[in-house]
Amino acid sequence: MKLTNISRLAAGVALALGIFAASAHAGEPLVIHIGYAAIGVDNRPYSEGTSAATARAGEYLEKEFANDPNVKIEWTFFKGAGPAVNEGFANNQLDFAYQGDLPSLIGRATGLKTKYLLASGARKPLYLAVAKDSGIKKIEDLKGRKVALQRGTNGHLAAIKILQAHGLTERDLQVINLDSAETVAALASKDIDAAFGDTDLINLAAKGSADIVYTTKGDDPRFGRNAGIIGREAFIDAHPDITQRVVDAFVKAAQWSSDESNRGALLELWHKAGTPIPVLDEFFRNDKLAYRNSPLIDDLLVSLYKEQAVKSKEYGLIRRDVDLNGWFEPKYLNNSLERLGLKTFWQPYGADGKPVAS
């Protein structure tokens, strides 16, 4: 055989192998990796208190792609909360995630290419629980005491704002960086004096092992926490149609979670995370479901994120300015609201916190 024929044969084999490899790759399912900046009791792969938690427990995304065998949904819940989600985005291991305001702003400041697609878990209250017989009755009593919070989370930023409003800073406290499970154990054993958090602390108080002495409920609404569904820019650009369907699924979950007639069923669904239903009931007491589960990127939400960005730098949590221009991407949300007939379902709020007339 001549050399030229050998070369042609080799080229043909290489071409065939290349086509085979490309076909095999094309036949591989698209795995949509979704992160959640929290985890359930005893590391259960569920959470509670947000429409994103509803989407997971109610399998809204799985149902959205049920007739697409080449699309798979994979959830990851992070004990390390928002900072761990940023690592997932940085390593291209996540396509979408539920994440709080501070860690998503930190990600933005450090150059992560993400987009804010819709709100989920916005306007969440924060609680201060204290150990039994600690003598702590109010925020000012925290001075010099051991106080737990999870650094780098939206609860961290909210706690600093609350302290500042009461004449304190982090430096006035002995701050202990603990996750939720560690906080509960330390507070129950009185290894710490107090802690900032939410349902885990409500549950601990219900058992008689701690006392709730403060909540942002009924206080300045800007002390609350915000969160949303964040998307990786490269995935969004490569798969706009898939992104639209992902947002559709989250909006459907938000709609169901906002219907007062579903309140009992909603708490039951969130109970998959291991949080007792009475605790969830207390967490949402006197709050309208539609207020807490709205997906809207309204003026109030945007203004709060801008304020958080400024405060984060002021408090030394972020070293540089955070450019939010172009980060909020309401296109997919607006399409969902139009397609699902939900344009007037949720009440938008202005930057002043007041309802905007429709």
What feature does the model see in each segment?
Residues A131-K146, D237-D241:
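Flexible hinge/capping segments at coil-to-helix
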Residues Y98-T110, I160, I192-I212, L304, ...:
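A ligand-binding cleft/hinge motif common to bilobed small-molecule-binding domains
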Residues W75-E87, G100, L168, L173-A188:
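Short helix-initiation/N-cap motifs at beta->coil->alpha
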Residues E28-A52, V71-F77, G144-A148, Q174-I176:
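Short, well-ordered beta-strand elements
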Residues G40-K72, T110, I162, E307:
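Short, polar/charged alpha-helical segment
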Residues I176, E182-G274:
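Pocket-lining segment of extracytoplasmic ligand-binding domains
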Residues V41-D42, A238-V322:
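Secondary-structure end/capping motifs
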Residues S312-S358:
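Conserved C-terminal helix/tail region of periplasmic/extracytoplasmic solute-binding proteins
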